[in-house]
Amino acid sequence: MLVCYGEILMRLSPPDRLRFAQAGQFDVRYGGAEANVACAYVQMGGQAKMVTVLPESGLGDAAVASVAGFGVDCSAISRKGDRIGIYFLEKGASYRPSKVIYDRKNSAIAKVTRADFDWDAILDGADDFFFTGITPAVSDPVVLLDALQVCRKRGIRVWCDVNYRATLWSTTKAGAVMTPMLSYVDVLVVNEEHARDLFGVTPGYGITKPEDRLASLGEQLKKLFGCREVVLTARESISSDDNEIWALLYADGKVSKSSQYKLHIVDRVGGGDALSAALIYTESGCIENRLVDTSDRQRQIDFACAANALKHSVEGDVLIAMAEEVCAVMESVKDGGRVRVVR
């Protein structure tokens, strides 16, 4: 069982890539980094539980229904507070970048207290726990620390995506708050920019090749926080519509680099969440069909990056795909990227 803790938000987007100034209506979806991971993980074949706080209202009900609709256990969601967090997304196009405006001040999770969750009960039977750096940015970090301490006591694997958001807090505060938390983390997901800005970790002098730079960062981060594995993600933006992505896994003193994906983007929100869900899937006990051998680090990072790539083709925050579909993408890129119709 995977347990995810974080905020579920309402997403409002102008249709057809209109700008905010042109919008006469908004498309409504629900998501959030941790919820996206839980939903994607369940579709791959795992079991997940979502922990958050939502208001007792029609909008809160809609958010719960959205996540529960994917098969995620929502029994640990606390219902209190006055409002749901919102974010407005203006999708970019060509040379116009996407824009995000958050409206999450005083949302339900911002008022969470230690009394809201019985972590011993919530984490009973859990194998994995996932959070991102967004959660301590928008809520009391002590509540998250309580969960991490129970995970340590119970031997539950902890996964963290740093997922820094400059509109939520400064790099100085983020680094100070997250540093003690990362000592509880088994697998850390981060990119080069955030490793530098939050934790002061940079590649060794004179290292220029992208994979060598990421390998240097992985080694240093593992030593700094004691993580078992470090995953570093990379992206090259050609335009708002076209990106190239890859990832690197540092574990057991060895580096595994994923295939590179050239993407034409439908919706890039949630790509990193899909990667995290796929990584957890590769190390979980739910892979009865052995789609990914847990001892094969190269195949693990290839599977995770394939999930990231596939999410960019799916509208909304959540990757909607089974593990077999992710595997098909993983194999297709090794076959020159040829995509065949499934009949």
Residue ranges and their predicted role:
Residues 10, 164, 194, 270, ...:
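Short, glycine/acidic-enriched loop or turn micro-motifs at the edges of active sites
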Residues 41, 191, 272:
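Short, conserved phosphate/pyrophosphate- and ester-handling motifs at nucleotide-, phospho-/glycolipid
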Residues 76-85:
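A short, structured active-site edge motif that brings together acidic residues
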Residues 1-73, 113-115, 257, 264-266, ...:
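Glycine-rich phosphate/adenosyl-contacting loop at the front of the ribokinase-like
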Residues 259-336, 340-343:
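Conserved post-catalytic alpha-helical subdomain immediately downstream of the catalytic base
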Residues 1-3, 68-69, 74, 92-255, ...:
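Ribokinase/PfkB-type carbohydrate-kinase core domain
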Residues 39, 86-90, 247-249:
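Short beta-strand scaffold segments in enzyme catalytic cores
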